[in-house]
Each structure stands twice: as C-alpha cells, then as structure tokens.
From Swiss-Prot:
Name the record gives this protein: Ribosomal RNA large subunit methyltransferase E
Gene: rlmE
Positions with a binding annotation for S-adenosyl-L-methionine: 45, 47, 64, 82, 104
First-listed, main subcellular location of the protein, grouped into a coarse class: cytoplasm
Family from the record: Belongs to the class I-like SAM-binding methyltransferase superfamily. RNA methyltransferase RlmE family.
Active site: 144 (proton acceptor)
PANTHER family on file: RIBOSOMAL RNA METHYLTRANSFERASE, RRNA METHYLTRANSFERASE 2, MITOCHONDRIAL
GO cellular component, one term: cytoplasm
Presence of keyword rRNA processing: yes
InterPro entries: RNA_methyltr_RlmE, RNA_MeTrfase_FtsJ_dom, rRNA-MeTfrase_E, SAM-dependent_MTases_sf
Length: 189
C-alpha cells in the first residue's frame, strides 16, 4: 500500500510505515529511558531503527522469526527465533534486563477475524508474560493487539503490573485495521 505514511517512511529512510505509530506514542508518553530495549516481532525493522536512535546507555535487542533489514552496529543484537522457544527466551534473558519492551508483532493473518484476533491474543499474552520476566522495576511495555473482545483481559493484566496503563490507536493505523496498542508504564507498581 502506498499511502502518506508509506511515502514518508521511504523519504525518511525507515523500513516500514509502522514506525510512525511508535513515534507518535513515544512523543505523547515518553517510552524511552536509560537502559536496554527489547523489540519483539522486529521485522522488517522500523521500530528497531527508531529505538536505536533513542537508546540511552544501553543495548537494543531485536527478536523475530524472520530476518530484519538492519545492519548490525554497536549496541545492537538480533536474535532470530520464536518467543515460544526456550532457546530464544534464554538468549533474550542473557542480554537483559530491559527498561523498555516494544512489540509490533502480529500473527500470520488468515482473513478470518475471529481466528486472527484469537491468535493475536495468544501472541500478546506470551509477549506480556515474557516482558514480566525481563523488565526492570519501573520499566515500560508497548504491545500491539488486534481488537476482538479478549483485549479486556490484556488490559486487566497490564493494570495488575503497571502503574499507568493506556489503550492507544495511533493516527498511522490504517482505517480498516482493528489493531490497537496497550502501553504499561512503571512496571512493578
């Protein structure tokens, strides 16, 4: 799709239009602080591109089952793997802990909204559970979720572990998309 955000991403050297969702959320809620950043579901790499620019005395770890279009530079590590795999989780833990976990991950879509939202829910819950293991106290978490009914459970889980919780639909989300983001700030209440 060649819309305003896709064209802007190309002009500004980002790998995907999705970066503008992260930029908008960060400008409103100041996600980045000192420390390590974990990007789950990093492919094609635009969230990682932006996160790398925002790093403050830490490392960026990008994780995905697919390769990403970024060169390996200082303080950047790419873990190719599935977050449901013990080996991948071990690598993530070895490089942590993290002050911020961001995720624009989405399951492979089928076109069946019920199936897609269910798969998104399961993936989101896994990302949250993993984040709870690797976040430092007062760390932040941003996760993409497909709306479909079960997202209230995700919101409640965020409320249980974070001082500040917000459901966000950035302007860069396509009109026909049912994706939203959940933000949790200040882990460990």
């Amino acid at each position: 799709m060649n819309d305003e955000y896709s064209q802007k991403a190309k002009r500004e050297g980002y790998l995907a239009r999705s970066v503008y969702k992260l930029i908008e959320i960060n400008e409103k809620f100041s996600l980045f602080s000192y420390g390590n950043v974990l990007d789950i579901g990093a492919s094609p790499g635009s969230f990682s591109q932006y996160a790398y620019k925002k790093l403050k005395r830490g490392i960026l770890v990008a994780v995905d089952i697919n390769d990403i279009g970024l060169r390996h530079v200082d303080n950047f590590y790419f873990v190719k793997g599935d977050i449901f795999s013990d080996d991948t989780v071990f690598k993530i833990n070895t490089l942590g802990p993290y002050s911020l976990v961001i995720s624009d991950a989405a399951p492979r879509t089928t076109g069946n909204r019920l199936v897609d939202t269910s798969n998104s829910f399961n993936l989101s819950m896994r990302i949250i559970d993993l984040s709870l293991e690797v976040l430092i106290k007062k760390g932040n978490l941003l996760v993409k979720v497909f709306q479909g009914g079960d997202e209230i459970q995700i919101f409640k889980k965020f409320e249980k572990y974070f001082k500040f919780v917000k459901k966000i639909r950035p302007k860069a989300v396509r009109k026909n998309s049912f994706e939203i983001y959940f933000l949790g700030k200040s882990f460990g209440k």
